[in-house]
């Protein structure tokens, strides 16, 4: 009952990548192929102003005028458009203002936002029961999260500070700094990947937590901003687009949007409460190839 998303092998539009202390060859390898996703749904700040709208400009050299007729080149391949099939749904705290969602070893780890309400929690999927929770300082607006090497990394909205927690105890064991806002956070084998509400993805070295590169995300030559909660799935970055029902599938090397997942209608009108807000929260179970999504104050997480 999974959805098969087929990615185009052509039509890539290479973007310049700004690097600090590294080359483009070792920054990231672009991945294309077949992505099989089963969708299961459940982060970034509620009353956030629109952030930078970084439209990319690209220059294409004009070919010389041919002296003899030639066959026109094939049209550029645009991003794939995908819908969804609900495989399962699980209870979700309807008061949780979801900012980040991660699946690990049979549990959901979730960060929630808003001043005075931000938390880090571990949740039992089948019941929605909160097994472990820690509150964040009332003066801090919590944002997205990622887990690696037995640690939970969390960013904050406007404090320019991230927190590091022990995965088992939820004890805070460190902090890290970054300029500007923090919205979403994901990780792959090499990097932590940070969004800030603009069209930029920043890549952080997980050892030093310093930025080592960034890409501009674009579709049809224009920047795609409002990048919010992130998840890395089969070589692609998935990003909630804030205040929409769509998830962008992004090539991590070029920044090109290779697909759009339209989740409009996922949460039925009768399932919405007076405080229900936007789609936000993506988690991936790599062992079983399952994708989960939810939203801010949604009553369910969908697979």
For each predicted feature, which ranges?
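Beta-strand-rich domains and repeat architectures in extracellular enzymes and scaffolds
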Residues: 87-119, 134-146, 295-297
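Short loop/turn segments that connect beta-strands within beta-propeller blades
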Residues: 123-128, 166-170, 206-209, 251-255
């Amino acid at each position: 009952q999974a959805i098969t998303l087929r990615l185009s092998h052509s039509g890539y539009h290479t973007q310049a990548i700004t690097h600090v202390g590294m080359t483009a060859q070792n920054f990231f390898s672009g991945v294309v192929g077949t992505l099989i996703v089963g969708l299961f749904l459940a982060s970034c700040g509620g009353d956030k102003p629109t952030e930078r709208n970084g439209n990319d400009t690209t220059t294409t050299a004009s070919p010389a005028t041919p002296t003899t007729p030639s066959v026109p080149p094939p049209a550029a391949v645009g991003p794939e458009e995908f819908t969804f099939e609900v495989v399962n749904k699980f209870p979700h705290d309807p008061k949780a203002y979801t900012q980040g969602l991660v699946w690990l070893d049979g549990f959901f780890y979730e960060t929630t936002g808003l001043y005075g309400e931000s938390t880090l929690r571990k949740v039992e999927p089948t019941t929605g029961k909160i097994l472990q929770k820690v509150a964040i300082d009332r003066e801090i607006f919590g944002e997205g999260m990622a887990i690696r090497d037995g640690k939970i990394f969390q960013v904050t909205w406007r404090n320019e500070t991230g927190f590091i927690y022990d995965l088992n105890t939820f004890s805070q064991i460190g902090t890290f700094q970054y300029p500007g806002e923090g919205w979403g956070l994901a990780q792959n084998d090499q990097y932590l990947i940070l969004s800030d509400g603009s069209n930029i993805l920043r890549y952080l070295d997980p050892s030093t937590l310093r930025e080592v590169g960034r890409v501009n995300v674009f579709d049809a030559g224009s920047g795609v901003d409002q990048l919010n909660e992130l998840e890395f799935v089969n070589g692609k970055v998935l990003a909630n687009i804030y205040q929409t029902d769509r998830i962008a599938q992004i090539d991590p090397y070029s920044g090109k949007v290779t697909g759009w997942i339209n989740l409009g209608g996922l949460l039925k009108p009768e399932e919405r409460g007076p405080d229900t807000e936007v789609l936000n929260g993506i988690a991936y179970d790599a062992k079983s190839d399952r994708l989960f999504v939810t939203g801010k104050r949604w009553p369910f997480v969908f697979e």
